[in-house]
Amino acid sequence: AGVATHLPDIGGRIRSTGVREIFEEGLQIPPLKLFEAGQLNETLAAMINRNVRVPDHSMGDILGAVAGCQMLGIKLNELLTNEQFDLRALARILQGRSETVMRNAIEAVPDGTYNHVVRHDGFDDRIVIDCTIKVKGDRMDIDYAGSTEQLPRAVNVVPSYTFAYTAYGVKVLLAPNVPNNEGSFLPITTTAPEGSILNPIYPAASGGRGIIGHMLPSAVMGALAPVLGNRFGAEGSANSSFTMTGQHAGRRYAVINFLNAGLGATAEREGHSVLSFPSNLGNTPVEMMESLAPIRIVLRRRRSGSGGDGQFSGGDGLDLCFEFYGEEPAVCSFISTRRIVPPAGANGGGDGACGTISVNGQEIDPAEHQVLRKGDRIEMLTAGGGGFGKPQA
């Protein structure tokens, strides 16, 4: 069993795209045993606790993840015992079937080379993702030569993440209903030049890699759009987040909260509102936001009209406004996307609205940390999804 989770804090500077190398991003833990023979590695736990702002929360979440893995192991063993399954044989069958379906789906795509370029807001310059797909028989090779070089910012995407979100884009287009396992991805390869934003050289920072990595499915869809009819959708947006740390009522806090944007429309339906693609994160509940940090939610509502026009409109983004009431200042940082380059419409559909972040009515650069004082108000508007097809008269 395995689990991936966001922790409230891992040390270093608080999470933002503004950090310039991995050493600012907190703990780097090589493969070590947290438990051995059922016993917690107290030395490792002490090291983690000493280097994070909220050790009870961070270690509590880690142990919660461990408990989840243990429960999955128990239930899997029960299933295998009760049903008399051979796990290895079952895995081979499932992976083999998934591989066959994916290879057949790729074979149905005409052999050839397909290209699409997507652009991100960037910092001093726009970030370019140049996606070239070569289809030959039952294989698909995706190359990102021509993409932006790695940056001294926390948006670099490590190769495993590049592959994961590229392969995901292929899967949702060609074989969305097949079980998600290694077999689905054996016919797919990805390459990116070393030193590029999709294959950075250590110690490049990558804590905000999602805002670039989550654009890769759109790059894949854009490249294959000419041969896939109306199976692709208009662009949406990765989610945004804000992280806050400080001290209130005698205790230290560190929290991370997520906000979704609008989903792009398709040839069959309007985009869902406040549902980022391809994110698998929900919006943080208001009750959690207010209970973990000294903030008061002034409003949280659908950002009406932010989706792009079209035969089918893009989904609307989110409008969130909160007020900070802590007696002591707090440091707040943001990870945000689609503030300059909007989610593109498709087949004549309109672009979605860009997102913005403002403090006391003044738009800010989300890459810069903000110091909040009592009474400060922050408003975050996430982007709307692109529309699909020309609007009907």
Where are these regions (language model features)?
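Glycine/proline-enriched, intrinsically flexible loops and inter-domain linkers
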Residues: A1-A393
